[in-house]
Structure formats: C-alpha cells, structure tokens
C-alpha cells in the first residue's frame, strides 16, 4: 500500500515507471467522460492504447445494464461494473457472487433502500437503477442534488445495516459483500488475462477522480487523478500519486499521451 500525502504533476512521473506500464485501469464517470459523454480525445486515447497493445479495463460503480453497450462499443478489454461485482467482456457477463447470494442480497438491499427513502426525504434513487444487479445507488449530483449532511446520513444508514458504502462523483453506492474496485481488478485480471495483479503491480496504472477511487490510489504506485479530483482533495485519505493538468476526459488523454511518449521509438529494420 502506498501512502501519498501530495499529488505530483503528471510531468514528474518517471519515464522508467511509464515504460513498465502494460495495463491501464480507469474509472468512467468524470474520468473518461465529460458531462456524461466520452469526448473525442478520450475515445481516441482508448484506441491508441489498444493499438499499442496496452490492456485497458474500466472499473466503475455504474450498473451492469448501463455499462453493457460501452463494453461492446469502446476499445476495452473489459468493464468491471457495480464496484467489482460484475464483469462485462464484449457480450459476455461474469458475476463475482453466485445467483443465490445475489438474490438474498437484493431482498436485504430493498429493505435498506426503503429505510433511506423514508429517513432522508430528499434522497432519490439513481436514474440508472433499473440496470443494477448487485447494489443500490442514491443520486447526489448527476440528476438530483443532495447536500453533505444528507450524503453522510445515507452512508450511515447503509453502513448501519452492514452494507459497504462508497461515494462517487455522482452517486452513493451500497452493497453486501467484501468486494470493491481493487478486488474487482484482481478478479478480472486473473480471469481474463491469467495475471496475478499484486505480483505485477508496477505494470499497471490506475486513473480516477473521486473518493470511491481511494482503495486504488492506496494500492497502486502508479496512480493518477484527473484534475477535477481537487474537488474531493480534502475528503481523500489516500491521494493519487500524480495529477493531470486537465479535467475529466481531457485529463485521461493526457495520461495516455504521457505513457505512449515514454515508449522507445522502434528502430526500422532493413
């Protein structure tokens, strides 16, 4: 585990560290996307990584249903949705928990959700909730605003009922299980690539933007926050090691450019 007390400018990322990178983990909302849409420079950056033979896996709190079209259409190896519980690889879907566990957890979560909506009158479920299979989500900044006190109360209710709770840039997510973004990364890296993530950690970089990325910032020596992470800086116990000059999708593209520019230029053979 790393313990970063300050964020260094992306330009200070050592070239030898960048050259070791063979895989990228990234958040989606407000990291790859800007105002809910992936900008051209971020999509182009994904294509560049694919062409360079660098694995790209998105890890998000978004639901499996919301993520499915992007898993098919974007140049990604996989999307791990619902904070590590569901993996989408092209048209295929994999679950971390078995069907019985998921069904039991759905019943428990529905009761917690009813409590939240009763105790916090301003709370609203996220508009993407229909596509959720293993968690619940309360909107705090995407289509509906919750103040800090209401957010804290929602988190408290989830945790009081034995749930894991995280706050992203747009939602409060809660679920039953010990999984998180890091466990999801370990799971899919082994399942899809046959690689032991912890034995190969210096070959990966994580890119994120908010408090629910902290477990990744804490674990990865190579971690980058896009510039809009400054909004959450005071709330972060673990900072990313580096920060981009630009926000959101443009910042993601800057990380990719930094990686690719560090690679040795192939010498033509006669």
What is each stretch, according to the model?
Residues 1-26, 270:
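Non-catalytic pre-domain segments flanking phosphatase-related domains
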Residues 14, 19, 39, 182-270:
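Mg2+-dependent phosphoryl-transfer enzymes with acidic/Ser/Thr/Gly-rich catalytic loops
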Residues 24, 49, 79, 223-225, ...:
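Short, well-ordered beta-strand core segments
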Residues 35-130:
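Active-site phosphate-binding/coordination module
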Residues 74-75, 83, 161, 219-220, ...:
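Short, structured coil segments at secondary-structure junctions
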Residues 115, 119-219:
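Conserved acidic, metal-coordinating active-site core of Asp-based
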